[in-house]
Amino acid sequence: MLDSKLLRTQLQDVADRLASRGFTLDVARIESLEAQRKVVQTRTEQLQAERNARSKSIGQAKQRGEDIAPLMADVERMGNELSEGKVELDGIQAELDALVLSIPNLPHESVPVGADEEGNVEVRRWGTPTSFDFEVKDHVALGEKFGWLDFETAAKLSGARFALLRGPIARLHRALAQFMINLHINEHGYEETYTPYLVQAPALQGTGQLPKFEEDLFKISREGEADLYLIPTAEVSLTNIVSGEILDAKQLPLKFVAHTPCFRSEAGASGRDTRGMIRQHQFDKVEMVQIVAPDDSMAALESLTGNAERVLQLLELPYRTLALCTGDMGFSAVKTYDLEVWIPSQDKYREISSCSNCGDFQARRMQARWRNPETGKPELVHTLNGSGLAVGRTLVAVLENYQQADGSIRVPEVLKPYMGGLEVIG
């Protein structure tokens, strides 16, 4: 969340910057609540001082043998008024807190200004879109030909937007995840992490999914116990490792990587990508998270994005890198790069990774800090996250880019050790 001091001292500037994201900040409401808060706080502070003085005078009057009943009555009345004032102040603060939690992050000055995905800027391309001398099949046709990609059975089990993988395609899916994890551990210096797939609400509030995006989550209600949510991304569990912590400067940067299933209701995606594995309720992802000192976060974003790009390069999959514009960035991000991989059957690039610097936005919500050696004081860390990569979409890209005329699939060179030396599927 944003610094409350910033909202008090530079409210209109914040509103102007948020407008570039297409977000309208309710300036009048915040100003009204802040004014109410100041009035009530001043009144309660004055009342507390007066009550303290009256309480002190009770002892003095008692020593003089005076009737202290009127003073006692005044102190009791003031105590009741203070209790009422605290309730009023808590109510105002709760509304302010709820407003602040609904406000997205401020975009970095280097982020291109735009209303939607049309305003995104291509930064670079790698590889040439794959060309074929035969009619291209999509991943659904390729997978269903041998019965290894089964949406009908998945629908029988779980409904729409699920997939059942079997045989060599299931193995290829596993190979991709293992390859990604090993690459990030061995070449990029990440620590492999196994996290819970169920988290409590404070973890999701910490990374920004709650309260604003609850409809996108799968919730498990438990009588007499805290609700649990299936993680929409391992970003939630990995980033919250440092929730409430004060880290030593020598611990930074922290670099975590995890392979997990992810669960999303896709509430806003009705009618979009209904065929195949592009948009699922359950999908696997290898997620990278970095916790860094504030001065290092922009350089860390470039490094993180490069780590994700390396996966695509080694798989020899054509892709492009986009700098997202202000209107297309995620809620918690200060700057984001998206990687889009070439999907031959769609004749276009599709998102396969999103790499974001969230600045101190998540850290403030989580109270994740480090001790700055220059000041000796705890300060907020910066957090970053990125897909390295979405395993299902990478599988789609491999199936389609490595297809052959007979419907068989060549196994990418870097995956052969994970496939027992198998060179062709089908």
From Swiss-Prot:
Class of the enzyme per the UniProt entry, highest EC level: ligase
PROSITE patterns hit by this protein: AA_TRNA_LIGASE_II
Entries under Pfam families matching the protein: Seryl_tRNA_N (PF02403), tRNA-synt_2b (PF00587)
GO BP field: selenocysteine biosynthetic process; seryl-tRNA aminoacylation
This protein's encoding gene: serS
GO molecular function, one term: serine-tRNA ligase activity
Organism placement in taxonomy: Bacteria, Pseudomonadati, Pseudomonadota, Gammaproteobacteria, Pseudomonadales
Provenance organism: Pseudomonas syringae pv. syringae (strain B728a)
Residues noted as binding ATP in the record, renumbered to the chain: 264-266, 351-354
Highest taxon of source: Bacteria
InterPro entries: aa-tRNA-synt_IIb, aa-tRNA-synth_II, aa-tRNA-synth_II/BPL/LPL, Ser-tRNA-ligase_type_1, Ser-tRNA-synth_1_N, SerRS_1_N_sf, SerRS_core, tRNA-bd_arm
Kinase is among the record's keywords: no
Pathway where it operates: Aminoacyl-tRNA biosynthesis; selenocysteinyl-tRNA(Sec) biosynthesis; L-seryl-tRNA(Sec) from L-serine and tRNA(Sec): step 1/1
Protein known as: Serine--tRNA ligase
